[in-house]
């Protein structure tokens, strides 16, 4: 029952404007039938009739969750329909038994597919089930081996065609101020279909949800430090795909002498920005909350003053035990991201101290890997090598993502040094490692992109040797192969054009 699509009479009502300003779609938005159904909906529906399961991918704010909900509603006429935002392996095994015993055809729609990948593998063993799942493209790229081509058809839904663009613009509610009534391809990359986010950014004049969050943080900082800290923490946790609980809030606000009751009242009072959360990551003993959009949370993290970010991160990881975090296994995949820490800790010594402290709680290769990337980004290559070597010692030499990171650090550490036989050998070694990663691993796009970026730089430093080695030609071959399945991938399209220019 918990995974069935709710009835219209039971869902919260809100203005559709919230959706167009950046909030995540809710069932009421879908039931109004006022959100344009793009051509990707029909394509995904057609794929769902084929033997394989379907995984739709795309950049943030490209309409994946909206499409998934729209298709779930339309599929009710085909059989039993379930919609899942997250599901634990244990719940998946229970669901497996229920579906197996029912013997009816069941369509299961799963958002945030990577977080539920173990559960998905359990459910795919049933012959009477069809899974249609969604995930962000860059997250899928790093774990694509979990969704094999034997089981899944992959659909990229990032781009909008001309008809969809104008239909989306025409469906924007009257209450939202527009600065444009159309979108020209001149506004974006003319060779790539624009995304929903690009169209909205060009057309809508009103403050986005992200701007409202940032403005609220500034106001809270002036007059109410606890509210500022709690809202920023909520954004951090949701960017890590975890809700904030009263338990976490009370532990975090210990220095303000807040107990659970005070923390609950504060979370409840911020209903303009935080929604009550009742999903799989919650329990019945306390209240949970999430910001109105994960993408908005990530934008807020990028726009927040770095000292505020650093203070929040250090306080959270000192005061909040991992045992208080529901699905810590999901949280830790995103919690120590090198780019995020690079913004929070511009001083590398402070950042190193943060990672060293974090490793006392989370002794995994992935944390060491992120620490190595952070240090490499700060050009502390000797320390970065120590950290990535320690990651390799934890996993052995068989983890392609660790080998990929080692190759990247090796290349960047030596690239700016004066040309010499030793420098050349290290750059060639890096390229060789990436070639082996590409050949040995299912995550082809992940390795092809890094190889292409390095091939372009290699040609600048050693043009004659680059030509003899054929790095650019090999990059072009790999990228063109991947673009057949991802024609609107902006990163790969830009890399392909750059390589083409370098080959002339």
Predicted regions and their residues:
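C-terminal leucine-rich, beta-strand-based interaction scaffolds used for sensing/assembly
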Residues: 241-394, 400-404, 408
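Conserved P-loop NTPase "ATPase switch" module shared by AAA+ and STAND
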Residues: 80-137
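Alpha-helical repeat scaffolds
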Residues: 310-317, 347-358, 382-394, 419-438, ...
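Winged-helix-like regulatory helical subdomains adjacent to P-loop NTPase cores
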Residues: 2-41, 60, 199-263
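Short coil/turn linking the two alpha-helices of tandem helical-hairpin repeats
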Residues: 340-345, 377-379, 411-421, 452-463
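Conserved small helical "lid"/interfacial subdomain of P-loop NTPases
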Residues: 138-139, 146-186
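"A position-specific structural signal for the A-helix of alpha-solenoid helical repeats
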Residues: 333, 369-370, 405-412, 446-457, ...
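Walker A/P-loop nucleotide-binding motif
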Residues: 49-68
């Amino acid at each position: 029952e918990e995974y069935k699509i709710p009835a219209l009479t039971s869902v919260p009502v809100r203005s559709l404007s919230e959706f167009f300003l950046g909030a995540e779609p809710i069932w009421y938005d879908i039931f109004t039938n006022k959100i344009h159904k793009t051509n990707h909906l029909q394509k995904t529906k057609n794929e769902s009739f084929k033997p394989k399961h379907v995984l739709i991918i795309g950049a943030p704010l490209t309409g994946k969750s909206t499409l998934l909900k729209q298709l779930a509603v339309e599929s009710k006429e085909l059989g039993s329909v379930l919609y899942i935002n997250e599901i634990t392996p244990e719940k998946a095994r229970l669901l497996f038994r229920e579906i197996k015993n029912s013997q009816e055809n069941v369509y299961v729609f799963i958002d945030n597919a990577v977080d539920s990948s173990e559960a998905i593998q359990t459910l795919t063993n049933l012959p009477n089930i069809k899974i249609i799942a969604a995930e962000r493209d860059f997250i899928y790229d790093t774990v694509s081996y979990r969704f094999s081509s034997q089981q899944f058809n992959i659909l990229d839904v990032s781009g909008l065609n001309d008809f969809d663009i104008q239909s989306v613009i025409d469906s924007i509610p009257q209450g939202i101020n527009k600065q444009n009534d159309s979108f020209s391809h001149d506004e974006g990359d003319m060779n790539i279909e624009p995304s929903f986010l690009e169209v909205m950014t060009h057309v809508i004049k009103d403050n986005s949800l992200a701007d409202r969050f940032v403005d609220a943080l500034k106001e809270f900082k002036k007059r109410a430090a606890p509210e500022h800290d709690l809202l920023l923490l909520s954004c951090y946790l949701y960017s890590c795909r975890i809700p904030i609980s009263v338990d976490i809030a009370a532990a975090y606000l210990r220095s303000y002498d807040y107990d659970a009751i005070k923390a609950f009242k504060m979370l409840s009072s911020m209903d303009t920005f935080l929604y009550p959360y009742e999903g799989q990551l919650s329990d019945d003993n306390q209240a949970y909350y999430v910001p109105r959009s994960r993408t908005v949370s990530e934008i807020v993290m990028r726009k927040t003053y770095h000292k505020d970010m650093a203070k929040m991160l250090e306080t959270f990881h000192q005061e909040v035990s991992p045992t208080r975090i529901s699905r810590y296994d999901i949280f830790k995949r995103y919690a120590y991201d090198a780019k995020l820490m690079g913004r929070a800790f511009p001083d590398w010594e402070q950042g190193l101290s943060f990672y060293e402290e974090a490793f006392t709680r989370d002794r995994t290769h992935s944390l060491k890997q992120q620490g190595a990337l952070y240090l490499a980004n700060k050009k502390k290559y000797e320390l970065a090598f120590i950290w990535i070597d320690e990651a390799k010692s934890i996993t052995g030499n068989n983890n392609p993502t660790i080998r990929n990171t080692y190759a990247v650090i090796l290349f960047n550490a030596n690239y700016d040094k004066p040309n010499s036989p030793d420098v050349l050998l290290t750059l060639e070694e890096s390229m060789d490692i990436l070639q082996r990663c590409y050949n040995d691993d299912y995550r082809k796009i992940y390795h092809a992109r890094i190889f292409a970026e390095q091939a372009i730089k290699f040609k600048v430093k050693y043009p004659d040797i680059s030509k003899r080695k054929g790095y650019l030609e090999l990059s072009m071959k790999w990228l063109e192969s991947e673009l057949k399945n991802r024609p609107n991938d902006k990163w790969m399209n830009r890399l392909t054009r750059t390589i083409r220019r370098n080959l002339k």
